[in-house]
């Protein structure tokens, strides 16, 4: 009765930037939910609509392959993050991000984000970018190659050991 679902093709069909999605909500919330959804996915051009239909109606084996690749990379990034002194990561259940706990490193989320970018050339997002409760966390993406993930986490591990994190 109070559930609103807003979704799209960005992650499932790797159609980021196409700005196509949908909303499902109870009739009594339709006006408010439409206002919320209208700026996200309105005025979608015909070519994008046809591409979205093709994605839905076409073979789904590539979606399954993509999901399996993300699971493999997710497992890799969580396993390797948990080997880094001062960091720990839970197994995420959605999207393609992990949010490792970095509190034992004694660095703030912003300090960690800056250090990783400037010292190691690894782009991350500070947990505080998602609100005050994100302090003590950093976001890693596993929407990258296994080789890049391995390289990045090996660099972080080496830095952590050399600088006595945790």
Q: Where do the language-model regions lie?
A:
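PLP-dependent class I/II
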Residues: 1-166
């Amino acid at each position: 009765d109070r559930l609103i679902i807003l979704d799209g093709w960005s992650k499932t069909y790797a159609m980021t930037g196409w700005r196509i999605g949908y909303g499902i909500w109870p009739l009594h919330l339709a006006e408010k939910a439409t206002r919320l959804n209208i700026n996200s996915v309105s005025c979608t051009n015909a070519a994008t609509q046809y591409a979205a239909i093709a994605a839905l109606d076409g073979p789904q084996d590539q979606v399954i392959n993509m999901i399996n690749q993300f699971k493999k990379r997710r497992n890799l990034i969580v396993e390797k993050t948990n080997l880094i002194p001062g960091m720990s990561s839970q197994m995420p259940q959605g999207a393609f991000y992990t949010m490792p706990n970095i509190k034992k490193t004694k660095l703030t989320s912003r300090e960690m984000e800056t250090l990783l970018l400037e010292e190691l050339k690894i782009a991350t997002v500070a947990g505080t970018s998602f609100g005050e409760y994100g302090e003590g966390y950093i976001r890693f993406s596993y929407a990258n190659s296994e080789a890049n993930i391995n390289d990045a986490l090996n660099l972080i591990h080496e830095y952590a050991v050399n600088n006595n994190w945790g």
